């Protein structure tokens, strides 16, 4: 259906945002369990375990086989066997042998690279081979070997999801977080993805699939007073080619109303000011000293 991008300024006042009614009733997937716990603590009954959980649970439910131990072990074995058996001589014999030996030793990096290529659905014919480093050329040859053999079945990544498939995956993710949740009571016309600032290929793929049948809300914290820090987030979310709806709530400031997090909030506020070059605005406690390093 669509992707909407919303920001918020004060994590303690999400319930004051214009979109509050929209996000408090639908499946809500956070970048981390820490964020889940924080939302549950602040908003209590409106953010109960189950409806609110981690995006990793959603990924593991949507791409169940791809994320399974059985799949990972099989793919590791396939890649090791391909490298050990030898590849077409695309490099000098000594260099190719050295790279093969190094990749068998650093097998996890090779495994992750090949997985990402499948997650991105890379067209092998669109790779400009002459622009690659020797190591990259070797990886591409492993990728080619997989694609041209029966081993490609071990790297199958489901892509054809029906609306019912998506709903079932969402239900599984929520039930994994809380076994007694009533999935039917959750509005699944909309899905929230909160706090992601490094979009891995598999997360991007999941968002695209969700957006085919649902409204996907991408939600992130934006503090305009710390533009040097938060500009990266604006740049990342702008890549979705959807307008970013900025918050209309006042910017967050450390408050003694939240004593547990107050000192941490003051520290974060000071770091933000330092990053913006606002040295004179930093509030100093008696045991804090600022040192300026000149290189």
Question: Which residues fall in each region the model found?
Answer:
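A short alpha-helix capping/helix-coil boundary motif
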Residues: 218-224, 246-249
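ASCE RecA-like P-loop NTPase motor cores
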Residues: 1-26, 35, 39, 159-219, ...
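Basic/charged alpha-beta structural segments of nucleotide/phosphate-handling enzymes
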Residues: 33-38, 43-185, 201, 227, ...
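Metal-dependent nucleotidyl/phosphoryl-transfer cores and adjacent nucleic-acid-binding surfaces
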Residues: 212, 229-248, 254, 263, ...
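Generic beta-sheet signal
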Residues: 31, 55, 219-221
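Helicase P-loop NTPase motor core
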Residues: 1-27, 32, 179-181, 246-295
